[in-house]
A protein has these predicted regions:
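Bacterial N-terminal signal peptides that target proteins for export
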Residues: 1-9
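Short, surface-exposed alpha-helical segments at coil->helix boundaries
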Residues: 354, 358-362, 388, 392
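C-terminal motif of bacterial Sec signal peptides marking the signal peptidase cleavage site
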Residues: 18-21
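Flexible, membrane-associating and regulatory peripheral segments of lipid-active enzymes
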Residues: 23-85, 90, 94-344, 353-359, ...
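Alpha/beta-hydrolase fold catalytic core
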Residues: 311-330, 335-336, 510-546
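A Trp-anchored, charged/polar loop motif used as the substrate-binding/catalytic surface
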Residues: 76, 323-331, 354, 397-407, ...
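Serine-dependent carboxylesterase/thioesterase catalytic core
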Residues: 99-175, 344-350, 376-530
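Short amphipathic alpha-helix adjacent to the substrate-entry channel of hydrolases
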Residues: 358-374
Length: 546
């Protein structure tokens, strides 16, 4: 007994000594809240280390040493334990491990990296949507948002791989994951364009937008992408104005029909998934298991990317050499026509161009209520041409849009059209809601135009420019810095210099000559002013009849 007592006392003493040693190492170190949150919120998304919560999970199950010794082998072994329980946290740890190791193996064509990134989407998707797992999801837990980001960014990485490997999902394709395969079939969801084999899908995460005051991004599920779409011959028919390619914002979502521990996987079959592509201007949420989830979307980066792909036309050239813009003039749609959205048409001013509006457009599209109700168009025109002539081009472009896009006049939204004009563009916009009668022509001649002998083309040009009525489908006009009563600068040295630089197309420059030879030239200063070289700057004079 005494021997046992001595052994017990010795063991107790050793235990107290060990515990005392540990106690001396436990304590606190003063820090700042910034440092505390930076350390506790760190994860594989913003560093080259696992999150503290993932490391804590590995330590609790005595797995840290195995992980540090051989990360990839550990990941293979650890993933095999997935279906041993209904542990939700294990799925998030696996997703983060796959994402981190995928980054370490990353190259655009790495099969291993692609397998890891796709596996990360499988585990993150299960963490977010499998309602049988424990514990229940807590939307206040930052790991909930981390799971969304791991899913989104892993999917974006996989999109890059798919592009580089030229994999097409028009027919189902089997792609490997850590254990088994995923059979993916592509499905377009309410897209305004026809997907082509030549389309490029570029993750928005790989670009930083510049030149815009604000960056608009809505958080949710899915990988925001920039789609560079090559137009087909069929799509070009009926378009107003287009380039050889269009740039769109889109969101890719990979919808898993099976859980990695579900019946499909247990039987050794591939998990089934659909690769869905959405237009965020048409769809802002998706339904998953009878619940609605917002789509992640980025509208600013595709806008900036579009501008970087195209050489902006010079506003100065558009003023002094009107013929240089002759083929470019007309209406441009930012996205294909949507019959349920009100068209907003931006009309730029003197020596300007449509790209002037991109900053404002970025802010308008960043407002959910506005982008749900409106679609945005641009009118481009050579700004050196006479104001009445440019207004006739705008009028004809709007009438053509009505004929092509809503020939039966059934779209109620089209009848609510809004024009937004800056500077001289405001004058063009104002003319769309005015009735000229014969007031402008009467300044030139007391005789009706039909009684005078003009070449047919010149006669039609004069009719279009000087005789007009309000467009019935234009409901509102917004004026920004518009010189409704003319501008003093038009008669100053700057105006005279501008007029001297403008070179009108021959068909316009010849009209004043024909008029002077045809009409009586004894109707006063107003007539004399209109018979001068009819440039836009002369049209802005305060004494001009316009």
């Amino acid at each position: 007994t005494s021997c046992f007592t001595r052994i017990f006392i010795l063991a107790l003493s050793l235990s107290i000594g060990v515990l005392s040693g540990c106690a001396h190492r436990v304590g606190v170190t003063p820090t700042t809240d910034q440092k505390w949150f930076r350390e506790m919120d760190r994860n594989a998304l913003d560093s080259d280390r696992l999150s503290e919560r993932a490391m804590m999970y590995l330590r609790q199950y005595d797995l840290e040493a195995q992980y540090r010794k051989a990360p990839l082998q550990f990941l293979e072994d650890f993933s095999r334990t997935l279906c041993q329980d209904r542990d939700r946290e294990k799925r998030l740890v696996l997703a983060e491990l796959c994402y981190l190791e995928g980054k370490r193996q990353e190259s655009p064509t790495s099969d291993l990296a692609a397998k890891l990134f796709l596996s990360a989407t499988v585990y993150a998707h299960s963490y977010l949507h499998n309602q049988t797992l424990q514990p229940a999801l807590n939307p206040f837990d930052p790991r909930y948002r981390m799971a969304c980001d791991i899913y989104n960014r892993s999917l974006a990485k996989f999109v890059v791989y798919v592009q580089e490997r030229d994999i097409r999902f028009a027919e189902a394709q089997s792609v490997p994951i850590l254990h088994g395969k995923v059979e993916i079939k592509g499905v377009a969801k309410d897209l305004p364009w026809q997907p082509q084999k030549t389309d490029e899908y570029l993750p928005s995460y790989e670009f930083l937008a510049k030149g815009l005051n604000n960056y608009h991004r809505d958080f949710g599920l899915g990988a925001p992408v920039i789609v560079v779409h090559q137009l087909s011959g069929e799509e070009s028919v009926g378009r107003l104005k287009t380039n050889l390619e269009d740039v769109y914002a889109a969101t890719v979502y990979l919808r898993y029909e099976d859980d990695p521990c579900g019946e499909q996987a247990v039987q050794g079959n591939a998990l089934r998934a659909q690769a869905e592509v959405y237009d965020p201007l048409r769809t802002d949420s998706i339904s998953i298991d009878d619940s609605s989830f917002p789509l992640e979307m980025d509208l600013s980066t595709p806008l900036a990317y579009m501008l970087s792909r195209r050489s902006p036309a010079s506003g100065l050239v558009g003023m002094v050499r009107a013929d240089a813009w002759d083929e470019k003039k007309g209406l441009y749609l930012l996205a294909p026509y949507q019959s349920d959205k009100i068209p907003v048409v931006f009309v730029h001013g003197l020596m300007s161009k449509p790209y002037t509006w991109l900053g404002m457009l970025n802010e308008l599209m960043g407002d959910q209520e506005i982008r749900e109700r409106y679609q945005f168009w641009f009118f481009m025109y050579p700004t050196g041409n006479p104001i009445p002539y440019s207004a006739s081009i705008l009028r004809n472009a709007l009438l053509e849009a009505r004929q092509k896009l809503d020939p039966d006049g059934k779209d109620k939204a089209f009848d609510q059209m809004v024009l937004v004009g800056h500077s001289m563009g405001g004058i063009l916009s104002r003319i769309m809601i005015q009735d000229s009668g014969d007031r402008l022509w009467s300044v030139l001649s007391k005789k009706p135009l039909e009684e005078l002998c003009f070449p047919e083309e010149q006669c039609q040009t004069l009719k279009d420019a000087l005789f007009f009525k309000p467009l019935p489908f234009v409901r509102r006009v917004v004026f920004i810095a518009t010189p409704h009563r003319g501008s003093q600068m038009a008669t100053g040295w700057i105006g005279r210099l501008g007029v001297s630089l403008i070179k009108l197309p021959v068909k316009l420059a010849s009209i004043p000559v024909t008029l002077a030879q045809t009409v009586s030239t004894e109707q006063g200063e107003a007539q004399a002013l209109m018979l001068k070289t009819p440039s836009s700057i002369n049209g802005l004079r305060m004494d001009n009849p316009m």
